[in-house]
Amino acid sequence: MRTLPVTLAAALSATLLLTACDDGGTGADDTKNTDPSNGPAACALRDMDVEVGAGAAPAAGDTGNVTVTLTNQGAQCTLKGFPAVDLLADSSTTNVLPEEGAQAQPLTLGKGATTSFTITYVRGEDDPAKSLAVHAASFTLPGAPRDAHELKWSYGPVARQEDGGTVDATVSGFESSGD
């Protein structure tokens, strides 16, 4: 009679332990999963109003910021990761890396909710060896790499880092706005 409660308690403990280890996900592809039972789908640019504001760098060596504000006009959606930003010049396209040490936090946007991210750059000289003559920037949202938005770049050339190839620019993670 005593062994039944001990056996039952052990079985119950094992079941609870195994259940606690399962997150209900499917593994590495969880961030791409758009199954409604696993939460909102990835946000798409086609459902966003896009506004751009800049604190342009006035002279070579100065730091400037370009803030992109997104307002969700569609159904609730989620941003998991960083925006992918490219700087476009006549002869090349350069990827902008996330800020050093930055960690992306998942952000869920309801209809009408707003978020923003910032491209920070160092204005370069009018010298192709030291700067990239950017004419546009393009960005996509995580989970929607084919849905790009391009904006005109009127903030001058972007400095190259000392390695001569990498641009001196970074992109922030998504910041929540409003309530």
Regions from the PLM with identified roles:
Residues 16-20:
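C-terminal motif of bacterial Sec signal peptides marking the signal peptidase cleavage site
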Residues 125-167, 177:
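Terminal connector regions
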Residues 22-25:
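Bacterial signal peptide processing site
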Residues 92, 98-125:
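Intrinsically disordered, low-complexity Pro/Gly/Ser/Thr-rich segments with frequent PxxP/GP/PP motifs
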Residues 73-94:
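Short acidic, flexible loop segments centered on an aromatic residue
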Residues 33-58, 172:
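Low-complexity, acidic Ser/Thr/Pro/Gly-rich terminal tails and inter-domain linkers that flank the onset
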Residues 1-8:
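Bacterial N-terminal signal peptides that target proteins for export
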Residues 64-72:
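Short, well-ordered beta-strand segments enriched in hydrophobic/aromatic residues
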